[in-house]
Every structure is written in C-alpha cells, then in structure tokens.
Amino acid sequence: MPASKFLIASCSAVLLWAAVLGPHFARPARADETCNSPYLSTLIRGKEDYLYVWTLGVAGMGDGFDKLVTLDVRPGSRTYGKVIAQASVGERGEAHHVGFTDDRRFLWAGGLDSNKIHVFDVGANPAHPRLVRTITDLGARSGLHGPHTFYALPGRMLIGALSNAADGGGVTGLALYNNQGEYIRKYAMPVDSGGDGYGYDIAINPARNAMLTSSFTGRKNYMRDLGALIQDPAAMQRFGNTMVMWNLKAMRPEKVFAVPGAPLEIRWSLREGDDWAITSTALTSKLWLIKKDAAGQWQARPVADIGDPAKTPLPVDMSISADSKGLWVNTFMDGTTRYFDISNPEAPKQTYAKKTGAQVNMVSQSWDGKRVYVSSSLLARWDKRGKDNEQFVKLYGWNGKELT
C-alpha cells in the first residue's frame, strides 16, 4: 500500500505515542501493538480499526490544548485516514505517553509538565473516546513528577515517572494507582548499589518474575531548549546510565545494570520460553541485550550500534515484532526508521532503513507486522525549528523488504 500521511489539522499535530489498538468488545477483530502489558485482559491479534493519538497542544492550532485524537484506519471506510474524534483536556501540559488499563476500557495519558494524568473512556465508544477523569495528586501523594509510562497490572496501573516534585531532577520512582484513579503507594528508584535513581520505561515478564526499568532525565532537562541543553556540559551529565531488574512479586530492586547513555524503551521477547529483553541508548546509539548468563544471572551488554554513534542519531521509540525476530527503531535527529534482524539477539543486524521524516519519534506495528505507523515530534522544546518541525502520522505497508 502507499504510505499514508494523516495530518491532524484542527488540533496539535504533535504525536508522542501511537496506539494501533481497539478494545476487544467493539468488534471481533482487533489488534494489539506488541509493547502492551501482558496483563491486558485479552491480547487481541487481528486488524486495527482506530489509531489513538495523544497530541501536544500548539498555540493557535484548534483550541491550542492537548487532546486525544482518533484516526480511522479501516481501509474502505469513507473516513479512512481522517480524524473522526477529538477529546481535549483544556490545557497544555506536555502530552507524551499513554497506556491501557488491564480491562482495556480506559486509556491513561500523562502530561510531563503539568504532572496530571488524564483518563479517557475508550470502551463505551471506541471511535469517540471521552475524558472522564483527571488525576492531579501524583506530586502531592508520591513526590514524583512527569508521569511517563503507564503499565497495566491486574486492577491497577503502575506509572513510571521521569522526575520529582522537589527539585525537578532525575531522581524519581514508580507510583501505583488502582483503576479507579486512587493512589496506593510509591516505589523509589534505587540510589545505592550503583543505582542513579533515574527512571523512564517499565517492562514486565511475569513468567520470570522480572520487571525491568530504564532511565532518562528530569524535568530541568526535558523542559529545556535542546540546543541550550546540549551546550551545557553539567546538564548533559544529568542523564540516566542504568537499568534495574526488579523482583516483580516483591516489587524490590534486585540488580542495577550499568547501561551508559540513557537507556529508553524496553521490549521483552514475546516468544514463549525466551528470557531476554532489548533496549536502546539515546546518547550512545546502541542496542543492549538483557539476558541470563550461563550461571543464571541477569546481565546487560551492548550488542549493536544504531546508525553512526559519532553522529548521535538519537534512537527513541522501538517496536518488536510478534515473533521477536524483528525490531523497528526510530532515530530522531536523522529522521530514519530502521529495521533490525534480531533472530539472534546476541548479534542484531540492521537490514533496512528509510528516512521517514525530519524528526521521527514513535513507531508502532500491527500484530501481523504488515502495517507500521510512524509519527513525528519528541518534546515541545526539543523539536526542530522551521520546515523541519514536521508534525504527522504516517502509515506504511511492510512486505518484509521495504516500507511502502
């Protein structure tokens, strides 16, 4: 199929997370993006109907506020490729990531600046999500700031924050809420045994009683102009360089891995029996493998470069295939979408690359791997200027050899 460019004209075109999903009770055939929590009530493997886009408000565009936008991605539909619904939150708060509750009825969406969590009902009418709740007590109850990752647990939501409410630095933690939006408790990121206290993503492998977290940077950095940040040596030292393996049942840190260069997204292999995960480092442009060694101990080590690390392509989002043999990686600075053959995770090989924009960030694929969604924009003050400040969502077909 030809690449389709879905522009969001009546609201912010900044896309920071793409969900190629639809709740299972709307129609029999639905699809899951492969990064979803394993605790979703049904991991549905079909064809997606709607694309949920959590967009960043831009002054002078629509109402100027952050909003959840719904795109129709049903081929043959008269509204295919068009915005069919918008749910505004009435403010700008640095919209970023979202995540489903385990029952798939609600989508939680965070503001990295506002520190608010907006809850949308996507179950009652999947084509027209509705804002039903805004959670405002994250800072007061947990001391955390910048809700980033929303990871479904049975009846609960585990939230990975980027910063703290005290000094805006990178020392942070995890907050646990129930599905009704009630705060339960906080888990601090470790600052001993080699830990730096930083946080970013969450990924769980229930079969191994294993939870991995990664690390990025605090509000002082992510809300700063990128050009000025890069020119500040002290600020550039304030990025995470660790990952943490947690005992899932005990919710206790068990091992800190040294992973220099801000490890971001984490993807566990989806093949039954596998015991490895993969991540990428934003500042050093490497793929890292987390796997047990011959002695049964978890270890982390670099296994491949992403582009030319000397040019800092800045890998951001990634998407693992359902058979865990392929990995899509977007690099922000050079606007490239790359495909790695990871059939041997010890030695990933880049087999394809395509420039898909000036500043690409998010990448999501359908469960069957035949459709790949790419979007632009990273953070409001990190995005490029002028003509390179592209705001889009693109749908590509993937035939195993090229994006079309």
Predicted regions and their residues:
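Surface-exposed loop and turn segments in beta-propeller and other repeat-based domains
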Residues: 82-94, 132-143, 186-197, 253-262, ...
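Asp-box/WD-like beta-propeller blade repeats and closely related beta-sheet repeat scaffolds
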Residues: 123-206
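Short coil/turn segments that connect the beta-strands within blades of beta-propeller domains
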Residues: 47-49, 103-105, 154-156, 207-209, ...
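Short loop/turn segments immediately following beta-strands, especially the blade-tip
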Residues: 71-78, 119-129, 180-182, 289-299, ...
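Beta-propeller domains
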Residues: 101, 194-343
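Loop/turn-rich, solvent-exposed surfaces of beta-rich toroidal or solenoidal domains
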Residues: 310-387, 393
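Blade-loop segments of beta-propeller domains
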Residues: 80-149
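Short, conserved, GDST-rich strand-edge loop motifs in beta-rich repeat architectures
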Residues: 46, 52-63, 160-170, 214-238, ...
